[in-house]
Swiss-Prot record:
Entry's cofactor comment: Binds 2 calcium ions per subunit.
Annotated localization: Secreted
PANTHER family: ALPHA-AMYLASE (PTHR43447)
Pathway participation: Glycan degradation; starch degradation
Gene Ontology molecular function terms on file: alpha-amylase activity; calcium ion binding; glucan 1,4-alpha-maltohexaosidase activity
Signal sequence, renumbered to the chain: 1-33
Organism (species): Bacillus sp. (strain 707)
Name of the protein described by the UniProt record: Glucan 1,4-alpha-maltohexaosidase
Protein residues bound to Na(+): D196, D221, D232, D238
Keyword Manganese attached: no
Length: 518
């Protein structure tokens, strides 16, 4: 059926389109990715297997000036509170108010150090102009102080909406009294009715069970990912985001955490397991109560752009997400032995569809070796992956501590010498209009034309997951006559920009080169 559209009809369609576009709130990704006129770069300053020596905050403190020199503008710190044990990475969250201050779980310090050491590290970062993002774990609590008798039913782990037993009493680890902290910072004590379920019955001690609590208002939170029927339950004691006391306490904690450390933003854990509207409203509340337009990025771990878009819509686009689909594209490319179609490297990604809401990353603590979501990008492809995230215009990139400093416990080498030149390219040269040349199965590239705010800026990135080669790319007529070299050192020689602003840039096989006017 052919539709006729006159001027009025066209204007109506245009107005409707503009209303849709303007209904998406401004996101801070654009601000953070272009930090005070320079390119912003986040570093995730931890990996899963850091030593339990209590010195990580001290390491961060002493590293602040070095991070600044590399162009790092924000640091995502690990969960800073007391976990279920001293060696807990922080995701077995026990007491969100204990930042290494009280004798609980057999220790005063956390895996990373004491509260005073943490605050000194934050001060050092701030003095170097680096923002601090706190990790936020609100989905569950671990390391309870005591058990309680709770009425519950078992559910099918593969379909949590299906009850597989009748109701009976279990012994659940759900009582949190915080005896070492008492009422300092907060007098709130957690009880069974603040949770939705657990995966352990202390009285029966059976593995591979998930128990959904019974009682007034008890049900899985409904506004979550639909994997396994309802993916509210993940681990430990699952927090009930429908309970008004819980909502109020977590909001109060968010304000306290922000003000105590002077945080500039958050990384929010496991949001696909948390009621979507809770996360949306929590962010809005903390921003309003602190008077700070806090940056926020959520971890929605699913290689499914549609599911991520649904989450962003349900949360009113008020924060960004990690680009998990891009991570898997990078991982798959690294495993394909040169047979990945590099023209499609951005297909199905957040940064392609919603660049203003995309935090791009290569790997993190969940994808590293021996973790539940292991999907570690192979070493040979890491420089290509970091060039893909660090030298392009779109997205707000994050650098993983385990890539930069290595993972000694698993024999993963530090790639600092490979990543530093790419960070330098981002800091000094990756500015201005972008021209894409994603037109070959193996060899792809793009250029940045530079801008007047950054003298000598502009670059040409070219990479191949197969054989080496070259590509003519446009860098700007104002670059005519300039002699460019490869900042990575992978290629020797130079490229002279012709009178029309084009250069013939080359790359080795299975490698990346970033050409700049040094």
């Amino acid at each position: 059926m052919k539709m006729r559209t006159g001027k009025k009809g066209f204007l109506s369609i245009l107005l409707a389109f503009l209303l849709v576009i303007t209904s998406i709130p401004f996101t801070l990704v654009d601000v953070e990715a272009h930090h005070n006129g320079t390119n912003g770069t986040m570093m995730q300053y931890f990996e899963w297997y850091l030593p339990n020596d209590g010195n990580h905050w001290n390491r961060l403190n002493s590293d602040a000036s070095n991070l600044k020199s590399k162009g790092i503008t924000a640091v995502w710190i690990p969960p800073a509170w007391k976990g279920a044990s001293q060696n807990d990475v922080g995701y077995g969250a026990y007491d969100l108010y204990d930042l290494g201050e009280f004798n609980q779980k057999g220790t005063v310090r956390t895996k990373y150090g004491t509260r005073s050491q943490l605050q000194a590290a934050v001060t050092s970062l701030k003095n170097n102009g680096i923002q601090v993002y706190g990790d936020v774990v609100m989905n569950h609590k671990g390391g309870a102080d005591a058990t309680e008798m709770v009425r519950a039913v078992e559910v099918n782990p593969n379909n949590r909406n299906q009850e597989v037993t009748g109701e009976y009493t279990i012994e659940a680890w759900t009582r949190f009294d915080f005896p070492g902290r008492g009422n300092t910072h907060s007098s709130f004590k957690w009880r069974w009715y603040h949770f939705d379920g657990v995966d352990w019955d202390q009285s029966r001690r059976l593995n591979n069970r998930i128990y959904k609590f019974r009682g007034h208002g008890k049900a899985w939170d409904w506004e979550v990912d639909t994997e396994n029927g309802n993916y509210d339950y993940l681990m430990y004691a699952d927090i009930d985001m429908d309970h008004p006391e819980v909502v109020n306490e977590l909001r109060n904690w968010g304000v306290w955490y922000t003000n105590t450390l002077g945080l500039d933003g958050f990384r929010i854990d496991a949001v696909k397991h948390i009621k979507y509207s809770f996360t949306r409203d929590w962010i809005n509340h903390v921003r309003s109560a602190t008077g700070k337009n806090m940056f926020a990025v959520a971890e929605f771990w699913k290689n499914d752009l549609g599911a991520i878009e649904n989450y962003l819509q349900k949360t009113n686009w008020n924060h960004s997400v990690f680009d998990v689909p891009l991570h898997y594209n990078l991982y798959n490319a690294s495993k394909s032995g040169g047979n990945y179609d590099m023209r499609n490297i951005f297909n199905g990604t957040v940064v392609q569809r919603h660049p203003s809401h995309a935090v791009t990353f290569v790997d993190n603590h969940d994808s590293q070796p021996e973790e539940a979501l292991e999907s570690f990008v192979e070493e040979w492809f890491k420089p290509l992956a970091y060039a893909l995230t660090l030298t392009r215009e779109q997205g707000y990139p994050s650098v993983f501590y385990g890539d930069y400093y290595g993972i000694p416990t698993h024999g993963v080498p530090a790639m600092r010498s490979k990543i530093d030149p790419i960070l330098e390219a981002r800091q000094k040269y990756a500015y201005g209009k972008q021209n894409d040349y994603l037109d070959h199965h193996n060899i792809i590239g793009w250029t940045r034309e530079g801008n007047t705010a950054h003298p000598n800026s502009g670059l040409a990135t070219i990479m191949s997951d197969g054989a080496g080669g070259s590509k003519w790319m446009f860098v700007g007529r104002n670059k005519a006559g300039q002699v460019w070299s490869d900042i990575t050192g992978n290629r020797t020689g130079t490229v002279t920009i012709n009178a029309d602003g084009w250069g013939n840039f080359s790359v080795n096989g299975g490698s990346v080169s970033i050409w700049v006017n040094k």
